[in-house]
Amino acid sequence: MNSKLQKVYRDSKYGFMDEMGNIIIPCQLNSAGDFRDGLARIVDQDKKHGFIDETGKIVIPCQWNEAGDFSEGFASVMDENGKHGFIDKTGKVVIPCQWNEAGGFSEGLASVTDENNKLGFIDKTGNVVIPCQWFGPYAFFSAGLAEIVDENWKHGFIDKTGKVVIPCQWEYIGDFSEGLARVEDEDKKYGYIDKTGQIIVPCQWNGAGDFSEGLASVKDENGKRGFIDKTGNVVIPCQWDYVEADFRDGVAVVMNIRNGSMHFYDINKNGKVIGKGGNFF
């Protein structure tokens, strides 16, 4: 669970405030991450990493050369030898520092890289459940799938058994949103695939965003942006210079530049302008 405390920066120091703007943790920290699982990463004057709770109390001393955010009760840490392992929320080392890199836990598994810089996955006991054979420093599971990269730097997906379910054939793969992920082919064109790897929207766009409320922004060959549905049909023509915010509660924010000014508009799912924002120089 994420905290309602928000990080603030004043006089070159970090602190935290609540939703009402009240300072809960004074701005006296050299560096701070966001709260995750009730703890936030901090860095002291010696550039050592530790963690505080939501009262500002240091609950894990600043003794690590690096640390990641807590996820599923564990945080990755790096020791003085440059090796990574994991601690629990008491600061106890639960997985020894023996890996070249380590990502956060997601769906019970965390990515690690071995001495050959090959990537695999371990469980919360530290056992290797997916052998180290892939490239890239980090990977995370979402909805049972994790993106992987092969020796040719092509992207695909594996499931939690390590089986390749979407072959490594793409230059880029985005996260799945509403069942579809955007992909980039060798011609630098974008389209969308489903979780079986089937191409649902052909790679024909110069840019593409995630699906939200059934629509995704796309960019045409003229650099203009519009929206498509999940079948690939253009439902809002490409006429905008930028999409500032995807659809939420039936409204998206788009922008055009005219004579050096940025003009913002709220549009509905029919593409109709229903409100205007300010103009910025």
What is each stretch, according to the model?
Residues 1-281:
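Residue-level detector of conserved, function-critical positions
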